[in-house]
A protein has these predicted regions:
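Structural motif
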Residues: 86-87, 160-162, 188
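Short, Lys/Arg-enriched N-terminal segments with co-localized hydrophobic residues
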Residues: 2-13
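Switch II (G3) loop of P-loop NTPases
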Residues: 167-169
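SAM cofactor-binding core of SAM-dependent methyltransferases
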Residues: 66-140
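Short, conserved loop/helix-junction motifs that constitute active-site signature segments
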Residues: 83, 103-106, 180-186, 215
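Active-site flanking residues adjacent to catalytic metal/cofactor-binding acidic residues
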Residues: 91, 113, 163-165, 191
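A short alpha/beta connector and helix-capping loop motif
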Residues: 173-200, 204, 208-209
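Rossmann-like AdoMet/SAM-dependent catalytic core
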Residues: 23-82, 96, 142-159, 195-286
Length: 286
């Protein structure tokens, strides 16, 4: 009996010791993994990642793509289908606002939000600024998309809208918390997604899958632009830029099943003057 008890105690001690050693190794190697873009978390198999990317293959929009905004960073490609869109909601105010300026010059009301700045760099009679971060809830310096839209357009619950969002990783919780009825009002959605290089991390992969589950209910991807601010990583033969700019269009405005063939649109421009990034064929239905 005594020997059994000692044996069991030894097992417990060894199990605890192994757990502590694994924890120490994880903590020590995690910064190294962050630097070299690998993770110690549970990994996703390449076929699952390819399946997700396959859902994101761009289809052709009914109207041709045009470029709105400046050359380089801050300019985006979206369909030439802006007539009838009453307002653009643009969370995340940077030093660059020419995308918003050009839309305002076309007669669109522009609603901007960001707690980190006092006001947009440029002024325009159609600009309406809210000093709040946009996120999952209404609390403190945060406001949800539904609350923001309802307060901005209190007498309009049906008009088409445009969403342009670059909020440094908060796009995920913002999309999750947005009502489907509001999401459906956005004829055009332009989002920069961050941390795409984590697509092989199991938890992030689940989050990414669920985000696009929601976005693709009534929208389709029509354009993907890799932001070349950081270099592309390659895992299991799959190229993944950390930052990807997606243009999505409501399904009544696309040619369903007609996929884009060109990997780089003639109007695409590098965000910064570094090495060019071109997405590989895996990102397109060829």
């Amino acid at each position: 009996m005594l020997s059994n008890s000692i044996f069991k105690l030894g097992e417990v001690i060894m199990t605890d010791l192994k757990t502590k050693i694994r924890s120490l190794i994880y903590k020590a190697l995690t910064p190294v993994g962050d630097y070299f873009h690998f993770s110690l978390d549970f990994r996703v198999y390449a076929p699952a990642v390819k399946t997700l990317i396959g859902r994101l293959h761009p289809v052709e929009s009914i109207k041709p793509l045009i470029r709105i905004g400046p050359d380089g960073d801050g300019g985006y490609l979206l369909p030439d289908d802006l007539e009838g869109i009453v307002a653009c909601f643009s969370p995340g105010v940077d030093v660059e606002s020419r995308f918003e300026m050009q839309l305002a010059d076309r007669g669109m009301e522009l609603f901007l939000a960001d707690y980190s700045v006092e006001k947009p760099r440029f002024d325009h009679p159609r600009f309406h600024f809210t000093k709040k971060y946009i996120g999952a809830m209404d609390h403190g310096v945060f406001m949800s998309m539904d609350t923001w839209v309802n307060k901005s357009l209190p007498n309009d619950a049906h008009s088409d809208l445009l969403l342009q969002m670059d909020i440094e990783g908060f796009e995920y919780e913002t999309i999750f918390s947005m009502s489907q009825s509001l999401l459906n009002r956005f004829r055009i959605i332009v989002i920069e997604f961050h941390s795409f290089e984590r697509i092989f991390d199991k938890q992030f992969f689940k989050q990414l899958n669920r985000v696009f589950d929601k976005l693709l209910v009534n929208h389709s991807v029509v354009h993907i632009h890799p932001n070349n601010y950081e270099k592309t990583i390659v895992v299991k033969g799959i190229d993944v830029p950390p930052f990807l700019e997606f243009t999505l269009v409501r399904n009544d405005k696309v040619h369903a099943g007609k996929y884009v063939k060109k990997r780089r649109h003639p109007l695409d421009q590098d965000n910064v003057p570094l090495k060019k990034i071109e997405l590989s064929p895996i990102w397109y239905r060829e």
